[in-house]
UniProtKB/Swiss-Prot annotation:
Name of the featured protein: 14-3-3-like protein A
Sequence segments annotated as region (Disordered): 240-262
Compositional bias ranges of the Basic and acidic residues kind: 247-262
UniProt organism field: Hordeum vulgare
InterPro entries (alphabetical): 14-3-3 (IPR000308), 14-3-3_CS (IPR023409), 14-3-3_dom_sf (IPR036815), 14-3-3_domain (IPR023410)
Upper classification of the organism: Eukaryota, Viridiplantae, Streptophyta, Embryophyta, Tracheophyta
Family in the record: Belongs to the 14-3-3 family.
Signal sequence, renumbered to the chain: none
Induction: In response to penetration attempts of powdery mildew fungi.
């Protein structure tokens, strides 16, 4: 084993250790080292999932914080507590700076290493979907021209991923389904296009249902779980109380072969 291979193996092990300890910032650091290793070629499925899990947890904590603070800000504004509102705005800006830094970090890594080195269709879709996801996270809190740019970048990345997925991945593939799920969330939440969101989610669900019998045992659980999330969103978006926003919109988990919501 070469020194580079040994270092790569050690960083992967340390990333798993950091995950067990729920030290996700360090998990990101270890997996970035793996991704940036010279002549590394494509990451293995395990490695790309570790990278995805690391970043999703780091960004997820800040996204949750931002939503909570934004909700409190709205309540205080409605009560006319201007002194509090100013402090909350300042605090929210701090969280937004952290969000921007995290998104910029993974987007640079995707553009410089991960997307260019991807050769298999599955890898290309995985990384382009990831690129779309992190541009979408920027669009969630940016305003004006920056929001418009983030939304446009999201659309380009998701469409590029979709083109490859439709051509090369089965309708029941967890990564293809996860892409459809997150792309539909983008249409609903960022572009305010509920009809497009529902059409995309319904088509992905219906196409997968038609091929469910041909699904191998290996990905059956992963695929059906994402299909359930697609159906949950469709139910929420088409119900009378969709506008009330009481329920959480579901997104693909940090790794398509995994569990959970955003």
């Amino acid at each position: 084993m070469s020194t580079a291979e040994a270092t790569r193996e050690e960083n992967v092990y340390m990333a798993k250790l950091a995950e067990q300890a729920e030290r996700y910032e360090e998990m990101v650091e270890f997996m970035e080292k793996v991704a940036k290793t010279a002549d590394v070629g494509e990451l293995t499925v395990e490695e790309r999932n570790l990278l995805s899990v690391a970043y999703k947890n780091v960004i997820g904590a800040r996204r949750a914080s931002w939503r909570i603070i934004s909700s409190i800000e709205q309540k205080e504004e409605s009560r006319g507590n201007e002194a509090y509102v100013a402090s909350i705005k300042e605090y929210r800006t701090r969280i937004e700076t952290e969000l921007s830094k995290i998104c910029d970090g993974i987007l640079k890594l995707l553009d410089s290493h991960l997307v260019p080195s991807a050769t298999a269709a599955e890898s290309k879709v995985f990384y382009l979907k990831m690129k779309g996801d992190y541009h979408r996270y920027l669009a969630e809190f940016k305003a004006g021209a920056e929001r418009k740019e983030a939304a446009e970048n999201t659309l380009v990345a998701y469409k590029s991923a979709q083109d490859i997925a439709l051509a090369d991945l089965p309708t029941t593939h967890p990564i293809r389904l996860g892409l459809a799920l997150n792309f539909s969330v983008f249409y609903y939440e960022i572009l305010n296009s509920p009809d497009r969101a529902c059409n995309l989610a319904k088509q992905a669900f219906d196409e997968a249902i038609a091929e469910l019998d041909s699904l191998g045992e290996e990905s059956y659980k992963d695929s059906t779980l994402i299909m359930q999330l697609l159906r949950d969103n469709l139910t929420l978006w088409t119900s009378d109380n969709a506008e009330e926003g009481g329920d959480e919109i579901k997104e693909a988990a940090s790794k398509p072969e995994g569990e959970g919501h955003s």
